[in-house]
């Protein structure tokens, strides 16, 4: 979503690219524990990482990270759960995430999901810093662990209904509350 980025192997020193930049693996499953994720402050520093295959780069976004799992049915968002990251980090890993039914994504993030996932049924995870989307995956965060941690069987049942039966039971919505928690 408007992010200046590209494949690292195609990046050459360029006066139009403002440093710092951020580099990371192109495939999300290869970034566990922020492996091979770096803030690059100079073109000389970048040369240390050029040999690593399948990296991407993006502008560095100095803003708090958030993440939202959306559940869609035929392109309509039927549920969302937003995870707020701690401002403190160890490397690029947050100290904690705050999960609450009161957390809401930025409207611009939801608008992007509605526009680009028109007709989609299932789960989508959107990670963003400020109003810039940095990663999108057709999955729940952490394999659904945060949803399971709500310990709300009605919420879990309704999400399963979307995937297994292409159905969202709106009658369960008043039973889908859960207590806020930190992870």
Please tell me what each predicted stretch does:
Residues 88, 101-183:
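ATP-dependent carboxylate activation and anion-phosphoryl transfer catalytic cores
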